[in-house]
């Protein structure tokens, strides 16, 4: 919009402690979530005639970390196009020049709930396996673009009442680092893999550990490894899964290895005891077979040593998951990331600001030319789920509240209720 941008295109509304200055096309703003990265409102898009989520990035230029994350999120959202990853519908700023530039608004699909609201419900095998399949498809698509998430958790995965699932964000930047001995919990890290906790190198199946933790929580209705900090979480991991082998210990940095080797030794608990038959659905002989398959999948995902952990492709072909396999979803063409140095870029804050401003202006220019002024197919409709049975086509009744909030489990509006129909 640059020079043609006028104050008359925008209006301001107070949302909690923040002022949203948005395009007039977005009406009926209602706060639905907040976190370290921003505040999210549900709104009605009067141009497209659909409900959307409007996210205001919180102080994107307060430091280099925030600025880099904002740039990374914007670039990736513009490039990624997959039914199991949230769609970006619009990007704008009310400021007219680079010098004034302070606020970034992202407009995305509006979903019905995040996984926190579904994960403790009584899900049958059909629903559970379909949700996991979609997670794996979304993860594989990110991996195909060289994006390894490393921070998957229920609060950044969203669902609709028809059981469709989407990943909200793109996780930790490759340059993000952690200090095993010193890092406290700033956000939920119950789902982070041992190699992230221990400061090791990692590969794509780092995200499989997170899926395993999420699946375990679906089954147990409680967090599997609820550590107070990284050290406490590591202790909870080895208490349940057992102390890893000497071969694994050799892969650790000396200071970390010294700590880990001096912990008490644990034999681990059998998966049949961690996940006994009675906690799974068991209404039929078929359920009993699926229970055995589900437990086998858990045992292959929740493996401390990443070299022995199942891969994303292997998980998609596992008997518990493969019933849903569709090449169009699981083998979708990779997104073309146009910034090859995205993960490695380091800039001063003002340089990040200019890069982000250029991305916003690029979007606005393309929108004026008609490139981006239509909703994505995923935003207004979704392909029927593979099953035609009513049990999977309805995670209903969904709350009438909606969500698109990712940073913390507590970010959801308290009025957003569980999905009653799945109980």
From Swiss-Prot:
Residues modified as Phosphothreonine = 183
Q: Which cofactor does it need?
A: Mg(2+)
Function text: Serine/threonine-protein kinase involved in various processes such as cell proliferation, differentiation, migration, transformation and programmed cell death. Extracellular stimuli such as pro-inflammatory cytokines or physical stress stimulate the stress-activated protein kinase/c-Jun N-terminal kinase (SAP/JNK) signaling pathway. In this cascade, two dual specificity kinases MAP2K4/MKK4 and MAP2K7/MKK7 phosphorylate and activate MAPK9/JNK2.
Renumbered to this chain, motif TXY spans: 183-185
User: What PANTHER family does the record point to?
Assistant: MITOGEN-ACTIVATED PROTEIN KINASE
Q: Which residues bind ATP?
A: 33-38, 55
Give the taxonomic lineage as stored in the record. Eukaryota, Metazoa, Chordata, Craniata, Vertebrata
Q: What is this protein called?
A: Mitogen-activated protein kinase 9
Q: Is Cell cycle given among the entry's keywords?
A: no
Name the source organism: Mus musculus
Q: Which GO terms describe its molecular function?
A: ATP binding; JUN kinase activity; protein kinase activity; protein serine kinase activity; protein serine/threonine kinase activity; protein serine/threonine/tyrosine kinase activity
Write down which residues bear the modification named Phosphotyrosine: 185
What domain comment accompanies this record?
The TXY motif contains the threonine and tyrosine residues whose phosphorylation activates the MAP kinases.
Q: In which tissues is it expressed?
A: All four isoforms are widely distributed in brain. Isoforms alpha-1 and alpha-2 are predominantly expressed in hippocampus, cerebral cortex, caudate-putamen, amygdala and the granule layer of the cerebellum. Alpha-1 is more abundant than alpha-2 in the periaqueductal region and the substantia nigra.
């Amino acid at each position: 919009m640059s020079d043609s941008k006028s104050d008359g295109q925008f209006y301001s509304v107070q949302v909690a402690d923040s002022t949203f200055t948005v395009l007039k096309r977005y009406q009926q703003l209602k706060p639905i979530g907040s976190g370290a990265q921003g505040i999210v409102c549900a709104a009605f898009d009067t141009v497209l005639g659909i409900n959307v989520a409007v996210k205001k990035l919180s102080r994107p230029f307060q430091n280099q970390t925030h600025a880099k994350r904002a740039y990374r999120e914007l670039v990736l959202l513009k490039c990624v196009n997959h039914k199991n990853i949230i769609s970006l519908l619009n990007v704008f700023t009310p400021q007219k020049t680079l010098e004034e530039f302070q606020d970034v608004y992202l407009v995305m699909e509006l979903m019905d709930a995040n996984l926190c609201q579904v994960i403790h419900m009584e899900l049958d095998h059909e629903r559970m396996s379909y949700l996991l399949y979609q997670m794996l498809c979304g993860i594989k698509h990110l991996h195909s673009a060289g994006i390894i998430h490393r921070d998957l958790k229920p609060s950044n995965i969203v669902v609709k009442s028809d059981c469709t699932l989407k990943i909200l964000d793109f996780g930790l930047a490759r340059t993000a680092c952690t200090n095993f001995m010193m890092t406290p919990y700033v956000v939920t890290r119950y789902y982070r893999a041992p190699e992230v906790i221990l400061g090791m190198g990692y590969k794509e199946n780092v995200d499989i550990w997170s899926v395993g933790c999420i699946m375990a929580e679906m089954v147990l209705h409680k967090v599997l490894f609820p550590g107070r900090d990284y050290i406490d979480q590591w202790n909870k991991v080895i208490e349940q899964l057992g102390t890893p082998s000497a071969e694994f210990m050799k892969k650790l940095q000396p200071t970390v290895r010294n700590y880990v080797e001096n912990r008490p030794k644990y034999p681990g608990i059998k998966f049949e005891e961690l996940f006994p038959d009675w906690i799974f659905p068991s209404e039929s002989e078929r359920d009993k077979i699926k229970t055995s398959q589900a437990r086998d999948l858990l045992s292959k995902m929740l493996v401390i040593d990443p070299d022995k952990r199942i891969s994303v492709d292997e998980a998609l072909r596992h008997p518990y998951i493969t019933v849903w396999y569709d090449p169009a979803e699981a083998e979708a063409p990779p997104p073309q990331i146009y910034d090859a140095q995205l993960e490695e870029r380091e800039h001063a804050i003002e340089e990040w600001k200019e890069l982000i401003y250029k991305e916003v202006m690029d979007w606005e220019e393309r929108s004026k030319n008609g490139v981006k002024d239509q909703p994505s197919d995923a935003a207004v409709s979704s392909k029927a789920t593979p099953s035609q049975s009513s049990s999977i086509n309805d995670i209903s009744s969904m709350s009438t509240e909606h969500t698109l909030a990712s940073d913390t489990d507590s970010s959801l509006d308290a009025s957003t209720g569980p999905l009653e129909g799945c109980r």
